[in-house]
Amino acid sequence: TQIDSCFIALHHRTHLGVMSKKTNATALVDFTSYLTQPFDFGTTINNGYDYTGLAQNGNIKPGYRALWSGDFVKNGKIKFTNPSDDLNSLFFDILSHPDNLSGNSNYNFAYGYYQGDYNLDGKIKFDNPADDKNMLYAQIIFYPLNFEYLTNFDFFLEQIPK
């Protein structure tokens, strides 16, 4: 059978995935372009929020969109505080790093391929300056649906149907 149309989903490591709307099976889908309209839940989740236009992060570089980073526990949401939060994943990546012999949360030499690497620079860092924790925090606080700037905001969701 020939497939004329399909949905294309993209997921990268510690990011929330994104999915195209129904597209031609032979079409090139550029998820970074604003011309590509990704699928979003809109108001269909019935949790009081409108996810229209929020399947991707449009505040990284003018004219482009990116995946939302920070899903360290890979549960389809980004969350800063307990339970099931992504911050603890970063914290324990730091504490358990093989070279962090004293178990310091402010360890500054944790290089490698770790879940808590928010900006994918090959280094995980929990305390200032230029740490992954505050990048995650800022993204959650300023997420467009987090109107009250809550650290325990629990509705930052991947917009791919299960």
What function would you assign to each model-found segment?
Residues 1-162:
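Cellulosome-associated attachment modules in secreted, modular CAZymes
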